[in-house]
Amino acid sequence: GVRIAGDSMEPRFVNGQTVWVKAAQDANNGDIVLCTLNDQGYCKKLCKDENGIALISLNKKYAPIPVREEDEFRIAGIVVG
């Protein structure tokens, strides 16, 4: 499992919680993913639409993180539990 750090995914995932991840290099819109963006690791909800890709926190106090074309972005896995 992977340990969550921080409160950006509350209330579904809390600081210090361990989540289980299925290795994957792609994911569907709405999946909770483990990914890297410009060498920074994230656990976020994946949003894919006509505007591109964004990483969404479940905690509303955090703004979405847009993934730009020039960014180095890689999905490592999908959170399954």
What are the language-model segments listed below?
Residues 1-81:
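Acidic/glycine-rich C-terminal interaction modules and beta/coil loop segments
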